[in-house]
Amino acid sequence: MVKRSLFLAVTAGLAYLVIDQYVVCPTYRFEAPRPFRGERFFNPYADFRPQDWTLANLHAHTASWLGVTNGRGGAADVYEAYDSMGYGFHAVSDYMRINRHGADAAAWVPAYEHGYNIPKSHRLVVGAGKVTWKDYPFPLTLSNRQDLLDRLSEDTGSAVVINHPAMRIGYNAADLKFLTNYDALEVLNAYEIAFRYWDTALSNGHFVSIVGNDDTHDAGNRRSVGRFATLVHAPGRTRAELIRSLREGRTIGVQVPQRADMPFSAKAAMLRRADTRLTRLWVDSGMLRADFAALVIDLEVVGQSGTVRFRADTALHLRLPIGPADTYLRIAYSTPDGIRYHFNPVCRADGPVGNRRTTAP
């Protein structure tokens, strides 16, 4: 009798979850995507000053939920690791929980990783006021994904980031043609690199900022920190500036070289000295232009559909004519210390640029 009751309860619960996800969830009518267009160009680095930027890691886990979730150590371990590398911001983003360690500090960032579904379709809410508990546990449809982003974006004081989109079956690259109401994409993650996903979003007119995170689950393991980072525009090192930079494209993705023979102290020193060498990035007279304070290495300019538009082994200046088919252009390069920097695109615009909008189901 007890087994039968338990079986019926489990069956009823599963049936509820299936109906809620595949029947009750709104079905969205997505507009046909279109590339960026317009005669003017939006440039998130128009007033670039190196001293206004600081390193951030916004995706790190600690031991929580009585050990059910994957995480070791505490928030103090996260703070110690990233403080030692000179980071201006280091959020703890436990699953479905806002960690309040250090909440009195001006640079404290309330954040959590949203999602407890099987495919690992996760989102990062930076500046979260509360946890949104709604999720869909089974393989997600495009409408499921959009509904969750819409719910999270109701908190207008936060920034919503799609985490590790290339991991498992959390997202399909084709989803990024349509999804709105998120601000940034975790392109750089220790588990997956997702340039194809980012270029899909950009090629279909969705301006979303690049983010790089370690996604460490044990900050005490120094090999799991200082791998990927985000440079954010925050002259005053305040949380409001951080969130605004994520929402307005003032971020730079950072890939840090990993060498087995490099002690953590050397990596920390390298990050504290990190310098993009960029002095200016601008558009003028139909040309993408950039100047560097010293030589940079392996310069690439990537455009529509992820096409490489230009390459140079070394460069002190960039002067690239912009063609009619260039809807966006983004640059990436390395410095002699091995750090690689990925910039958000300069893109065509015929109105406001961003990815927050009303999506009607």
Predicted regions span which residues?
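Substrate-binding cleft/loops of secretory-pathway carbohydrate-active enzymes
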Residues: 105, 170-182, 219-229
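C-terminal functional module detector
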Residues: 1-49, 65, 218-361
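Structural recognition of alpha->loop->beta junctions
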Residues: 175-193, 229-241
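Short acidic loop-to-helix transition motifs that present clustered carboxylates
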Residues: 167-171, 192-193, 315-316
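A metal-dependent hydrolase metal-coordination microenvironment
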Residues: 22, 28-165, 178-180, 188-199, ...
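Glycoside hydrolase catalytic-domain groove-lining segments
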Residues: 201-208, 212
